[in-house]
Amino acid sequence: MARLLLLFFFFLILLHYASCSRHEQEKDRIFHLPGEPNDVSFSHFSGYITVNESAGRALFYWLTESPPSENPESKPLVLWLNGGPGCSSVAYGAAEEIGPFRINPDGKTLYHNPYSWNKLANLLFLESPAGVGFSYSNTTSDLYTAGDQRTAEDAYVFLVKWFERFPQYKHREFYIAGESYAGHYVPQLSQIVYEKRNPAINFKGFIVGNAVIDDYHDYVGLFEYWWAHGLISDLTYHNLRITCEFGSSEHPSSKCTKAMEAADLEQGNIDPYSIYTVTCKKEAAALRSRFSRVRHPWMWRAYDPCTEKYSGMYFNSPEVQKAMHANITGLAYPWKGCSDIVGEKWADSPLSMLPIYKELIAAGLRIWVFSGDTDSVVPITGTRYSIRALKLQPLSKWYPWNDDGQVGGWSQVYKGLTLVTIHGAGHEVPLFRPRRAFLLFQSFLDNKPLPM
């Protein structure tokens, strides 16, 4: 009898817990976004998770589930992180790359993304760290002291609490994805998730694109790409190599900064994120003026401002913020795609992610690295040098992969890692080549090489 009472009491506790979780979920449900198409079928949620009570740090998320026709209960969960550092996953990942909606030029209405990755997985976008997008801290100094370590630690706390709010995703296949400076965020968070071994988080691996991996090899590849594509002179190439290559991208020397400035002048008014794409002149000029203020000059361009005008209009709308349960504290500044303060004051940035790659490769996790081949900010050359430094055993030859009879890019499979390039894509691969990015993601989830 006592045992039955104990079991009944335990059942009541579980029932209460499930009811609380469901209530928290429903508070975050998005019923309608201003300007959305009439035929939206999938469920989506957004809101805040507090990651540090004493400092008042809370991170904003947006979950877009797979449509009912795709059986979302059977689909994995994928966390997407954008880099910068200091740039929003809502602005870039969700609104112009892999999310279900794109924003029209009027900044008020939305249209469907035919190659949205939520057709293949449930997508969780996180604005991180605090101070980015709608994520906030009640401790002002947090915005000036953000760095790699705290970003990873806060993201892990977010995940643990988010899985409590959405318990139906516990034990579901879980992956982490991202691009650019998320080449730090993704492996660092992956390392914590792997080492913590939380039974609720069924972590399987990660995928990163045009990723910052290793300062030395990234520098070598960056300067080589500029020179080989005729963007800089022989003299500037020489000066960059002797002044920058053995330094930190986060804390460059004055000589390195001077060489970077010379390279910038020689490159002229191009779009560095996609060197064959026409620029938007006003924003490019404003971006160039930021160069002298940042401490990591080769990453000074964080993300292309030419593509973020529409998102700035949309996500600053009070009606949109209300629908998304965003800006609930009344931030003293407008929502922006990238936070200048967070990016410029970045505190800690390890020189290399290669030791983490080695640890997670040895652990047997699925790891894919992809690169758009027209990006001159974090180009394919640096990525290839970094991967070569891992000294992995090749399992396939370097081969062209097929996209409807055309070369979609090139790939090579190694023991523990797959490298893929996307032909004709810039820094934000899904923005420039959405179909090819979709095929890439599908192959990653299926754990199959891209087709020859």
Curated annotation (Swiss-Prot):
Keywords: Carboxypeptidase, Disulfide bond, Glycoprotein, Hydrolase, Protease, Secreted, Signal. PROSITE patterns: CARBOXYPEPT_SER_HIS (PS00560), CARBOXYPEPT_SER_SER (PS00131). It comes from the Eukaryota. Residues 1-20 form the signal peptide. Disulfide bonds join 87-338, 244-256, 280-306. GO terms for molecular function: serine-type carboxypeptidase activity. GO terms for biological process: proteolysis. It is an enzyme of class 3 (hydrolase). It holds the Pfam family Peptidase_S10. Its main location: secreted. Its EC number is 3.4.16.-. SUPFAM superfamilies: alpha/beta-Hydrolases (SSF53474). The keyword Protease applies. The keyword Disulfide bond applies. InterPro entries: AB_hydrolase_fold (IPR029058), Peptidase_S10 (IPR001563), Ser_caboxypep_his_AS (IPR033124), Ser_caboxypep_ser_AS (IPR018202). It is found in: Secreted. Ubiquitous. GO terms for cellular component: endoplasmic reticulum; extracellular region; plant-type vacuole; secretory vesicle; vacuole. Glycans are attached at residues 52, 138, 327. Probable carboxypeptidase. Belongs to the peptidase S10 family. This is Serine carboxypeptidase-like 26. It comes from Arabidopsis thaliana.
